[in-house]
């Protein structure tokens, strides 16, 4: 676990990441991972998932276990715990406040969750629309 966590680019400030994601000049696709204990265990079982985590542009400590391990093993006392939900809500608010129409693409595991997500975003964010919803098989 120590070696794995040490190799990650753990993010301590979500505001900076959101600024980078919203930068109109930066057209490159960005990959964010919200790592918790469950997803860490999955990396041990799934080599493709582990490679995806290791190649991510941004890795957030989205679980108390990862957060504490980072602080204990690597003295990352500055590291904030940033949950996927909090980050996502902040990102959607920033996207919507740009007053420009933005398109979203979601990948998820269950159709029912994607439908609920789509409805909530349509109801609450007037500048955001969907290009696609995709299930993972």
Predicted regions and their residues:
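N-terminal nucleotide/polyanion-binding subdomain common to many enzyme families
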Residues: 1-85
């Amino acid at each position: 676990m120590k070696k794995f966590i040490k190799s990650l680019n753990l993010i301590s400030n979500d505001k900076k990441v959101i600024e980078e994601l919203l930068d109109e000049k930066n057209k490159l696709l960005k990959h964010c991972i919200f790592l918790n204990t469950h997803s860490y265990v999955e990396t041990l079982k799934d080599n493709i998932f582990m490679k995806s985590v290791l190649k991510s542009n941004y890795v957030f400590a989205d679980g108390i276990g990862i957060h504490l391990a980072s602080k204990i093993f690597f003295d990352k006392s500055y590291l904030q715990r940033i949950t996927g939900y909090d980050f996502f809500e902040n990102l959607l608010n920033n996207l919507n406040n740009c007053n420009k129409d933005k398109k979203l693409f979601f990948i998820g595991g269950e159709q029912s969750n994607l439908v609920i997500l789509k409805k909530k975003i349509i109801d609450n964010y007037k500048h955001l629309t969907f290009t696609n919803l995709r299930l993972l098989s």
